[in-house]
Amino acid sequence: MQQRRPVRRALLSVSDKAGIVEFAQALSARGVELLSTGGTARLLADKGLPVTEVSDYTGFPEMMDGRVKTLHPKVHGGILGRRGQDDGIMQQHGIAPIDMVVVNLYPFAQTVAREGCSLEDAVENIDIGGPTMVRSAAKNHKDVAIVVKSSDYDAIINEMDANEGSLTLVTRFDLAIKAFEHTAAYDSMIANYFGSMVPAYHGESKEAAGRFPRTLNLNFIKKQDMRYGENSHQQAAFYIEENVKEASVATATQLQGKALSYNNIADTDAALECVKEFNEPACVIVKHANPCGVAVSNSILDAYDRAYKTDPTSAFGGIIAFNRELDAETAQAIISRQFVEVIIAPSASEEALKITAAKQNVRVLTCGQWDTRVAGLDFKRVNGGLLVQDRDLGMVTAGELRVVSKRQPTEQELRDALFCWKVAKFVKSNAIVYAKDNMTIGIGAGQMSRVYSAKIAGIKAGDEGLEVKGSAMASDAFFPFRDGIDAAAAVGITCVIQPGGSIRDDEVIAAADEHGIAMIFTDMRHFRH
């Protein structure tokens, strides 16, 4: 499988010029003839490198403002020509073999992401010659090396040095795979961009057009293979988006512990996204994708202590997320108190890592700090299809709330209501959250009946000896009947926050008034399935 091919002639044409001068210098120093186009050629010439413009090489000028540069038989014949099979026809037409193509494409994604980008701007940043050369070289990888990533430059030079100026078939094949991935992702971006414009071109309303293209092309990069999936009989892998712009489990760095499992990643994502909702030092403990304890306080140590007290039984083997650096004192409290699968935080102190290292199986991840939440898409696979929606980044503020009961909430009740409303957003529907003094005291998750979620939240609080009287209750969706309010009143809830919107809202509000409960409408639902 060695099948080495010497690199004697290379064509370089890049939009992202990072590292290209050094790479070209290294190639030239090893006797490689350099061909290039436009700005790349000028850059290399300015650095004193012996470079031949493609227009001089082909005898055909660049034209149409650079739209036509490399689309010429002398270029593509040199790339596609099969060594040992097409040599005669190449010689007949004066076509020299090109052994390496170094290309990256016009910055289409960056262009369309710019505010005020016009259709004309987008069109002019659709690369034609680049993808054509990339695909030609990748197709003929038995003889030609195609380089689309600057991160490969050093490894290529090292291999050439180790193989007397040649590259192996294994390397050329690997580079070809990267090339096809590169062009597939590029074409997908273009298809998605123009696909989302189709309704507007057909004169349909903006509402009908929405933001979704008529075909959806997704590109993810495999980060790791896994021992198994959600269950041991399922195979699995973890794929991530390229250029993720927000701190996430996908971009987190694992500092210690065993490899993350499928369920670890899903639960860590749930914990991290929940803790992001809070500005104060916060701790979220998750089990099976549901928060089982959440608290905010003046320190993450106290926040952890209070979150743990919500449900110590469920916290065993859970995932713990913080929105502040993991410090030694908090790490010690966790390790001394419970078995934990994963701890994730923006950062971790050296002292904290020394403590967690005593438990080798504990996975510690750092994800960096987050300043803003980035809008994007959520996906849910169904048999034969894919549901797509915007990420649920919605969250009401105190000024947007509507008090619909006779009694107004106290300042403390209002704070508790907003706190448990943030938590309810991340609890599986039907979701009920009891909270008091910035701490969950009972969580009812995933029940088919909302009233049973309310009952479970009360049972959990009672089992842990937590005082419900005077607490706030959040419901992720409206109460269809008054029974949920009656159940809340029976355990001492004094404030309820919910979306509203039921045909029986009047009946539900009347129940709150009967019990002296302050009721707040958010006019925003947070179903989570």
Swiss-Prot record:
Pfam families assigned to the protein according to its UniProt record, in alphabetical order: AICARFT_IMPCHas, MGS
MF terms in GO: IMP cyclohydrolase activity; phosphoribosylaminoimidazolecarboxamide formyltransferase activity
UniProt KW Transferase keyword: yes
Gene Ontology CC annotations of this record: cytosol
Biological-process GO terms, alphabetical: 'de novo' IMP biosynthetic process
The entry's keywords: Hydrolase, Multifunctional enzyme, Purine biosynthesis, Transferase
Metabolic or biological pathway: Purine metabolism; IMP biosynthesis via de novo pathway; 5-formamido-1-(5-phospho-D-ribosyl)imidazole-4-carboxamide from 5-amino-1-(5-phospho-D-ribosyl)imidazole-4-carboxamide (10-formyl THF route): step 1/1; Purine metabolism; IMP biosynthesis via de novo pathway; IMP from 5-formamido-1-(5-phospho-D-ribosyl)imidazole-4-carboxamide: step 1/1
EC number(s) recorded for this UniProt protein: 2.1.2.3, 3.5.4.10
Domain named MGS-like: residues: 1-148
Catalytic activity: (6R)-10-formyltetrahydrofolate + 5-amino-1-(5-phospho-beta-D-ribosyl)imidazole-4-carboxamide = 5-formamido-1-(5-phospho-D-ribosyl)imidazole-4-carboxamide + (6S)-5,6,7,8-tetrahydrofolate; IMP + H2O = 5-formamido-1-(5-phospho-D-ribosyl)imidazole-4-carboxamide
Domain notes: The IMP cyclohydrolase activity resides in the N-terminal region.
NCBIfam families named among the record's database cross-references: PRK00881.1, purH
Similarity annotation: Belongs to the PurH family.
Matching HAMAP family: PurH
Entry protein name: Bifunctional purine biosynthesis protein PurH
Top-level taxonomy: Bacteria, Pseudomonadati, Pseudomonadota, Gammaproteobacteria, Enterobacterales
